[in-house]
Amino acid sequence: MINQATGSPGQLGVDDGDDWMSGDQVEYNGGFWPISKGGLDDLTYGESVEQGLDRLGQRIAAENPDETIVVVGYSQSAVILSKYKAETTRGNIVYVLVSNPARPNGGILSRFRGFTIPVLDIPLSGPAPTTSPGWEAGEDPTTFDVAQQYDGWADFPLYPLNVLATANAVLGIVYLHGNYESIVDPDTALAPGAAVTDSRTHGDTVYYTVGTDLLPLLRPLEQIGVPKPLLVALDAPLRVLVEQGYDRTLSPGESASARVLRIANPVTDLTNFVHAIPVGIDNGLEAAGYDRVLGTARAGMYGVGGPQPTPPSADAGENLARSEAPQAKTPERRNTTRSPIRGPVKVNRSFAKSLPKPGAPATSTPQPRTGLLKRLVAAAHRDTGADTTAGEPKPKAPSAGKHRKRVEN
C-alpha cells in the first residue's frame, strides 16, 4: 500500500495495529523538494513519483497474477497508484485512493493537466483512469476513492477565479489534508446512509466525498477564539459563495479541467445567498443550544441551493467480495530489474465488503471505531491469516515508504 507523500519517505503500506500505516512497505523517497522533510536532499516530486512507480511495479510483478492484491495510496502515493493503474495490464488489483491529487474532477493534477512546474519538477499529470485491465462496464468496482470536501489537493475548485473558493481549498490543504485518520470517522462518514457523504460510481471507481462541517476559511478564526456558534452562522452564506467555484452536478470521476468563466443565473445565485442567511442564523442558534427560531431547515453539505448528496449504501462491494477479480490478460509492463523491495504482498478477495456503494438504507449495527485507513484496510486482510491484538487487526500487505509527517502533500 502507499501512504501520503511528502515530509518523510513515502510508503505503500498497510495498517498494523496502532501505527495506521505500518506493516510491510514498498519504500520510496516521498519527496517534495525542497520543502519536504529531507529538504535539499530529497528527490523532486516528479522523481519521487517515478521512483515509487518503479518500486511498486517490481513488487506487484513478483506476485501471483491470479491472486488479488489490495493497494492503498494517500496523497502523493495515490498519484503513484493512479499512474500505475493507467500503465499496467494486470488485473486482480483493488485500489484504495485517499486524498488523490489525480481525482478526475477535483484533483489539482487534473484541474491543471498538461503542464509541468519548472525547477520544482511537478508534472501536472492529469486524471486517474476509471477503468481497469479486464474490467467491463456493469461489473463490480475495483477502485475506491475517498476525499474530504474542500481538501485542496483532491477537491480543488473548477472555477479557480472564484477567490473565496480557491482560498478555501488552499486552507483545506492546511487543515484537512494531513488529518484523514483523525478527522474522518468511517463509522459515520462511510456508513450506509451517511448524510455527510456523497457517494457516486463512475466507471470502475466508487467515489466518496466526505462533507466538511466548517469551511476551512473559518478555521483561522476558530483558532483565535471566535465562538463556534458565530462561525457556524457565517458558514451557510459563505458556503453558497464558495460552492459557486464548483459544479457538483459533475461526477468526481468525470474528467474536468479548470475553467475560466462560470455561466450561471445571477438571480439564482443571489437568491441562494439571501436564503442562506436565516439558515445560518438558525444553525448558529442550534450550535449554541437553542431552537431554530426562524424555522429553516439545515442545508446539505453543498449548501443552500446545492444538490443533495447521494449517501453510501449497505451493499457496497458485496459482489466484488464474492467474486474473483478479472484475470490479468498480459504480463505487467513495468521494468522489474531494479532493487528488490522487502516483504511479501498479501492477497485478499473480501476487501470491499466494508465499503458502501451509492444508494441503500442505513444499517443500525455500529462498528468499532478505528482510523479511516485502519477501517478501509482491515477488511482487506481478514482472509490473510493476519494476527490480531486487543481486537485490532495486524495485517501485513504492500505499502510505499516511511510515514512520519502527515501534513504535506
Give, region by region, the residue ranges found by the protein language model.
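Composition-driven, intrinsically disordered low-complexity tracts enriched in small residues
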Residues: 1-74, 83-409
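Catalytic nucleophile loop
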Residues: 77-78
